Amino acid sequence: MKLSPKAAIEVCNEAAKKGLWILGIDGGHWLNPGFRIDSSASWTYDMPEEYKSKTPENNRLAIENIKDDIENGYTAFIITLKM
């Protein structure tokens, strides 16, 4: 599912509340219709073995990444979560 910047940040906030790890974010441009991914706007954060204590930091970094991408003109995102 492609998400607007606001929705992508909301997903990260909800993931943090539920203790879910954000594995990656891919930024791109919504073209109406369609989505063009930009490989230079791909963010991943390796999941350590003892990840639960680091989940809040991971999700904070994910939100910071989205905000940086918004400033760089990206308009749509795909988020990958670890359930």
UniProtKB/Swiss-Prot annotation:
Record keyword Transmembrane present: no
Biological process (GO) annotations?
A: bacteriocin immunity
Q: Which UniProt keywords apply?
A: Bacteriocin immunity, Plasmid
User: Is Transferase a UniProt keyword of this protein?
Assistant: no
Instruction: State what protein this is by name.
Output: Colicin-E5 immunity protein in ColE9
Q: Which domain of life is it from?
A: Bacteria
